[in-house]
């Protein structure tokens, strides 16, 4: 499972969500920035009062001391902003909505990872069961092909003797062509499933890998009441939706707090030098930002988030209903497949008895060879159907585990 790209991606998503929580929390703490600027200039003052010399006898004139050939200065500054009360945060010490939103997103991702893991397990299980089932059906299908080839030869001999019509030969010849196509397909299915399973398991080479051709037996059906009342309450899909409800709640809180004034402490310092003389100033203060009028934009945003919160709460019940429906469907399909297996087993038993009788009659010279061949063809076909149904039953239990999100496990 550790080689699954899906699970690897989910792991990185969780790491990213953790960093987003830290980033959201850091935005609530003091923010300090600094700047350094170097400037050079030459020329004269452009203000009309800056260039007039009022001390001259005539009361006016150009002040030549305002001319500068070239000068350079350095400016160094720093700015500190500390949000005291903003978007529900009080000095960054409480559970602010902005942080809780990111935490809810991470919770949803964690439970989604559980669902992803079950999806990967189901995919591997499905390919394994299909592949082993296909490999186990190769020999019976090849046996059916050999029987049909013998049947075609016998039909042709019987036709030459005038005992059968050409239409009879044509029918069995078409069956032989279909059987050959089916034999090719089942071999390709087995090969494709084997290679696909290696890829899903993250294995590069198939030289030293041998697939066990024995399928496990089906488990006992789990207690439905326990699944409904105990395990269903801990289903990852429900917990994902609970995280979505919490996220919607925090979104609502965040937008609601934005209706209130915000308070921030700020301070700045500036140091200026022309590399001969220096100057500096320091500024500190408190800024209170009060929302006065925005034509109802923020209030309507709050209402939208409130209704979204209510929708997510209602959706929680819908998720529970969907899970209950999936569980009922899984039990129904398990029953239908089990009933089909029971029916096929009974029919296979009768066909096996018919084959033994036909073979015995053929040995005694009572029945023609085609009777035994047809009886064996019917038995092989029924055994193939039975093998398909048994593999399908295993898939039904794998689907049940997937539907339960891993709260009930057949495959660890």
Predicted region positions:
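Short segments within alpha-helical structural elements
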Residues: 16, 26, 178-205, 346-406
